[in-house]
Amino acid sequence: MSFEVLEKLEAKIQTAVDTIALLQMEVEELKEEKQQLQNEAQELREAREALEQRAQQVQQEHAAWQERIRSLLGKMEDVE
């Protein structure tokens, strides 16, 4: 093989190595981003569950107050 062919081959190999290194860095960045998104998704799920529980609690409180009001109105009608 001639010296020129070896130089071209070396340049191609170096380009491939550089490309692989860049791709590895990109993969690491994507892994970190994925982990951050998974964490954020988990936090959002937990927040949604907390809101759903609070909404259910408020509905129960609302129903209890409605029942109390009905009871008081019934007592007022009995007094009249």
UniProtKB/Swiss-Prot annotation:
Stated family: Belongs to the ZapB family.
Assembly notes: Homodimer. The ends of the coiled-coil dimer bind to each other, forming polymers. Interacts with FtsZ.
Source organism, top-level taxon: Bacteria
Lineage: Bacteria, Pseudomonadati, Pseudomonadota, Gammaproteobacteria, Vibrionales
Subcellular location: Cytoplasm
The encoding gene: zapB
InterPro entries: Cell_div_ZapB (IPR009252)
Single Gene Ontology BP annotation: FtsZ-dependent cytokinesis
Source organism of the structure: Vibrio cholerae serotype O1 (strain ATCC 39315 / El Tor Inaba N16961)
Functional note: Non-essential, abundant cell division factor that is required for proper Z-ring formation. It is recruited early to the divisome by direct interaction with FtsZ, stimulating Z-ring assembly and thereby promoting cell division earlier in the cell cycle. Its recruitment to the Z-ring requires functional FtsA or ZipA.
A single cellular component GO annotation: cytoplasm
Protein name: Cell division protein ZapB
Coiled-coil annotated spans: 3-80
Keywords assigned by UniProt, alphabetized: Cell cycle, Cell division, Coiled coil, Cytoplasm, Septation
